Design a protein with these regions (language model features):
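N-terminal leader/targeting segments
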Residues: 1-101, 494-501, 601, 607, ...
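Hydrophobic alpha-helical segments
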Residues: 1-38, 322, 383, 420, ...
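Membrane-interface helix/helix-cap signal primarily in integral membrane proteins
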Residues: 2-15, 82-258, 565-572, 578, ...
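Non-globular, low-confidence helical/coil segments that flank catalytic cores
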Residues: 2-3, 43-44, 109, 123, ...
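Residue-level signal for inorganic ion chemistry
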Residues: 32, 113, 167, 354, ...
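Alpha-helical transmembrane segments of polytopic membrane proteins
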Residues: 46-57, 357-358, 418-423, 477-482
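Hydrophobic alpha-helical transmembrane segments in multi-pass membrane proteins
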Residues: 71, 246-415, 475-525, 707
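Membrane-interface helix-loop junctions at the exits of transmembrane helices
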Residues: 299-303, 370, 374, 395-412, ...
């Protein structure tokens, strides 16, 4: 959640459509982006809604010619809205086309690039390369790859150096499971790669920002334990690549994950610290404004222009400008101005969850803080406690549908954590920030001891509140999220409380919202075809029958929280809340946690594993959840129900393909990795089968002779007509 400067009591005196054109421009840019997105993912409902809005505004434009001047202002606002719907649509469309232009094919290249980012995790290392050179031609996008640390000379793998290697590249799909892969697009990562052969390293130089960040890293690593140093680095500059997974899970489970992303909370604290110091030095307001603006711009650069940091910085600078010139501080207009700047420069940020949570949280605080605070004061609750609770509740209520859409759960301990832990965290942030600045010049290790101990207290309290668990919450789609926010806005004082029938209209909107959410959470019905879909990770597919039975085949290739989240998102996107069976042909102990979590979350009835699974693993899985666990030799046919059978094809003790028999019609699904021995097996044994495979395999395996009926991109659906 976020804190913002105090809300002026005059913010809600007038109607929004009369006095806040910036808000209408911001809404127009959002609707324009969604309009473009809806056509790309074929969201017919959203298209219809936006067409209706466009039609209404067009009618208003015509009518405005014949209306009196008093009413004309309303229609001029609508005209402004439609203009920026068009602007937002054009900018988003341009960004989509720009990112979706892949100049390189998915094959092997000799690639040279500058190391931009390095993340080490036990035995593996993940590297992001920039300033890419392929065949003596420069490209302005980045490439990301992971490999074993033993494959590289770690002394040379530092930010600023360059490397040259043979790599197998694969383009990043902008849309996965109906959602934009905004985290990669924000970092301009167009390709992921697999390292084939390392060729050479080159010594390079760091930028000024990189040198500063490296200096901060060294100070933190010298004075704090490893996990706390990377946590501190994350909350100072927003770089989470080396943050330990269990530490992130702790903050997430207790409802404090928002403090790990540099946001309005952190920017606000920095502004408070520096402005306080500058005022003590008796600097005049214009000089404070200039110096603070310069510092915040530098901070945005250090944080790689994170949307939440840019938003908070723009709002802070705007408030300082208003204070400097004695102007009224209008929270909604300042908030909208920040959003306009970001969407004009980076249109795809609209689809980034960090942008959504940051702006919606602040929107909720602007709308709901005052009425909730007044309610707490009515019960004689202390001002500081009432203020903290009001901010937390306002942001939580507003972001509820976005949290539901992306995570499907809400931490029970959120309120307690934000009331008790957040003030302690805020105090520790002050100490950490000041000690890090002093550490650039002096040895202040004794101050870092305080930071270390306060972190220990935070971890202990977080562990207690995380034990409260979480509750599952309903799924929301884009339409229902928009409706939810409109209802919130309409119910507040920003819409004239004297408006006739306001309560009746609000109740009607709530009723429509409830019905829409219910429809959104209704399992899709497939009456004719069998639906086969793959997630945006390797070796994981879902099969939905015409009787709406769901079978999850495979749970990924690496295990870990990322794959679990991607699988859960895939199932939620398809409105699948119950899975009849999880089938894993190549079981490994690293899949154990994900299988257990998926089984609990999606009420899995059966888990079917390959025959070489140990009894110890079976007992472990049975202990974690209530599903029945079976083993099967997948070289023999397994009957799932009356219509569907499955069997696997094995080479070198590993299944690389499996056969689905649906109503006596056979389909063979191939794994993404096709070695030459597997290709030979296909040519000899499966050439008369109907195959479903990844499109990349078709491109790279021209020597396969088979009857290909479907080519899979990530997140594609296939209707098996039988």
């Amino acid at each position: 959640m976020e804190t913002i400067p105090s809300i002026n009591n005059n913010d809600v005196e007038d109607k929004v459509v009369n006095t806040r054109p910036l808000f209408c421009i911001f809404i127009g840019l959002i609707l324009g982006g969604l309009f473009t997105y809806s056509f790309i993912v074929d969201n017919v409902v959203l298209q219809i809604l936006l067409i209706i809005i466009t039609t209404i505004v067009a009618i208003c434009l015509v009518l405005s010619v014949f209306l009196k001047s008093k009413l004309k202002s309303y229609f001029l606002i609508f005209i402004l809205l439609i203009i920026f719907v068009g602007v937002g649509s054009l900018l988003t469309c341009k960004s989509f086309k720009s990112f979706s232009n892949y100049p390189l094919q998915n094959t092997e290249y000799i690639i040279e690039g500058r190391i931009k980012q390095v993340a080490k995790n036990e035995n593996t290392i993940t590297i992001v390369l920039q300033n890419i050179i392929v065949n003596n031609k420069k490209y302005d996008y980045n490439i990301k790859f992971s490999t074993l640390q033993s494959n590289l000379e770690n002394d040379y793998i530092v930010v600023g150096n360059a490397l040259k290697a043979k790599m197998q590249i694969e383009n990043v799909n902008l849309i996965n499971n109906g959602k934009i892969n905004s985290s990669l697009s924000m970092d301009n990562i167009k390709y992921t790669a697999k390292l084939k052969e390392m060729i050479e390293y080159k010594i390079g130089s760091k930028t000024i920002a990189e040198k500063f960040c490296n200096k901060v890293q060294n100070i933190l690593l010298t004075n704090l334990s490893n996990e706390k140093s990377w946590l501190s680095y994350d909350i100072l500059v927003g770089d989470r690549v080396n943050l330990q997974d269990d530490l992130y899970s702790l903050f997430k489970d207790c409802g404090l994950s928002h403090v790990l992303a540099v946001s309005g909370l952190h920017v606000g604290l920095i502004v408070v610290i520096i402005v306080f110091i500058l005022k003590k030095l008796r600097l005049k307001q214009p000089y404070i404004l200039l110096l603070m603006s310069f510092i915040l711009i530098l901070y945005c650069i250090l944080c790689n222009f994170s949307p939440s940091v840019v938003r908070a910085s723009i709002m802070a600078i705007t408030y300082l400008v208003a204070e400097c010139f004695g102007k009224r501080k209008d929270s909604l207009s300042v908030f909208s101005f920040a959003g306009i700047i970001i969407l004009l420069i980076w249109p795809l940020h609209l689809f980034y969850i960090g942008f959504q949570l940051s702006f919606v949280a602040v929107f909720g605080i602007i709308l709901l803080y005052k009425p909730i605070y007044n309610m707490f004061k009515h019960f004689n609750i202390l001002s500081n406690i009432a203020s903290s609770l009001s901010v937390t509740l306002s942001a939580t209520i507003a972001t509820f549908p976005i949290m539901a859409s992306n995570f499907g759960e809400l931490s029970i301990g959120t309120l307690f954590s934000n009331l008790i832990i957040l003030p302690i965290f805020t105090l520790n942030y002050y100490i950490l920030f000041i000690s890090t600045l002093l550490g650039l010049i002096f040895n202040v290790s004794f101050i870092f001891l305080v930071v270390e101990n306060i972190f220990n207290i935070i971890f202990s309290l977080g562990g207690v509140f995380s034990m409260l668990g979480s509750i599952e919450i309903s799924n929301f789609n884009t339409i229902t999220i928009l409706m939810y926010l409109v209802v919130l806005f309409f119910a507040t004082e920003y819409v004239n409380p004297k408006l006739k029938f306001k309560n009746i209209i609000t109740l009607c909107m709530v009723f429509v919202l409830v019905v829409s959410v219910a429809i959104c959470n209704t399992t899709k019905q497939y009456n004719q075809n069998y639906i086969f879909a793959n997630s945006n990770i390797e070796n994981c597919y879902v099969l939905t029958t015409k009787n709406n039975a769901n079978y999850l085949i495979g749970v990924g290739s690496d295990g870990g929280e990322y794959e679990y989240n991607q699988i859960a998102k895939m199932l939620y996107y398809r409105n699948i809340f119950n899975v009849d069976a999880i089938i894993v042909l190549n079981y490994d102990v690293k899949f154990q946690d994900n299988i257990a979590m998926l089984s609990n979350k999606f009420k899995v009835k059966q888990i079917i594993l390959n025959e070489n699974v140990s009894q110890q693993d079976i007992r472990a899985l049975s202990k974690y959840q209530k599903s029945n666990v079976f083993v099967h030799n997948f070289e023999k046919l397994l009957k799932l129900n009356e219509d569907i059978c499955i069997r696997g094809y094995m080479l070198n003790n590993s299944y690389f393909a499996y056969n689905l028999c649906v109503n006596e019609k056979e389909f063979v699904i191939l794994d993404k990795s096709l070695t030459q021995s597997r290709i030979n097996y296909i040519n000899e044994n499966l050439k008369n089968k109907q195959l479903i495979l990844y499109k990349d395999n078709l491109i790279n395996s021209v020597n396969i002779s088979y009857n290909v009926i479907k080519e899979l991109n990530y997140s594609s659906d296939v209707k098996l007509k039988v």
